[in-house]
């Protein structure tokens, strides 16, 4: 079944089904399939589930823009945090995104920077939330990983922002802390924190973003 998503809807990109389920239920979104990706929609929004990883998130964002003609993209979901300065389930508006596995330092570039680009992409932000940087890679980040302190880590944010920047589409990114990467967590703890973080981010999206326009900075 192909999507019937009309032009100029608000597009949402999430990596996992568990992150999509609260919005699907709340807005009674109808399912379709576009190029193998699950898409859920109503008259106002399109939500696509990319599955985890930088390639999947790049493709899914392109589909929202190119095939589904969305006017603005919001990526939301759970992320790791590299310090204990915030608690689990804290919700952030992402201000800058970095590609964590980029390394051209041998050519004289700063860490995380491609030779012909800045080291990060600047995003518009929601001023009602704390602002945080997010570092994206396909690598699971654990206690021994070499990452900056007090940042979010995920597997899709930079790619979403890069595609939106390429096509001049406004982009907002929201993340909720599901795990503290400096800690060793059991699988039971990970599962519990994941559900709580999903509930926190989806409650904010439903109650604050969709029911009231965000107060944005940097547009």
Question: What do the PLM-derived regions correspond to, one by one?
Answer:
Residues 4-11, 45:
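Extreme N-terminal starter segment of soluble prokaryotic enzymes
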Residues 34-219:
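Glycine-rich phosphate- or other oxyanion-binding loops that anchor nucleotides, phosphorylated ligands
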């Amino acid at each position: 079944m192909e999507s019937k998503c009309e032009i100029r809807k608000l597009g949402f990109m999430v990596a996992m089904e568990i992150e999509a389920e609260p919005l699907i239920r709340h807005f009674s979104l109808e399912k379709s399939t576009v190029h193998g990706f699950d898409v859920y929609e109503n008259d106002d929004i399109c939500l696509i589930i990319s599955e985890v990883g930088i390639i999947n998130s790049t493709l899914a964002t392109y589909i929202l823009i190119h095939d589904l003609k969305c006017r603005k993209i919001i990526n939301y979901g759970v992320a790791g945090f590299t310090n204990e300065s915030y608690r689990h389930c804290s919700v952030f508006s992402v201000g800058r995104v970095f590609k964590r596995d980029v390394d051209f330092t041998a050519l004289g570039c700063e860490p995380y920077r491609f030779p012909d680009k800045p080291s990060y992409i600047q995003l518009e932000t929601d001023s009602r939330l704390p602002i945080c940087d997010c570092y994206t890679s396909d690598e699971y980040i654990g206690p021994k990983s070499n990452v900056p302190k007090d940042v979010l880590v995920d597997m899709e944010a930079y790619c979403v922002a890069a595609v939106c920047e390429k096509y001049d589409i406004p982009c907002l990114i929201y993340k909720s802390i599901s795990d503290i990467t400096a800690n060793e967590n059991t699988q039971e703890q990970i599962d519990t924190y994941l559900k709580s973080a999903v509930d926190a981010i989806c409650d904010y999206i439903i109650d604050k973003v969709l029911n009231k326009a965000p107060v944005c900075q940097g547009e």
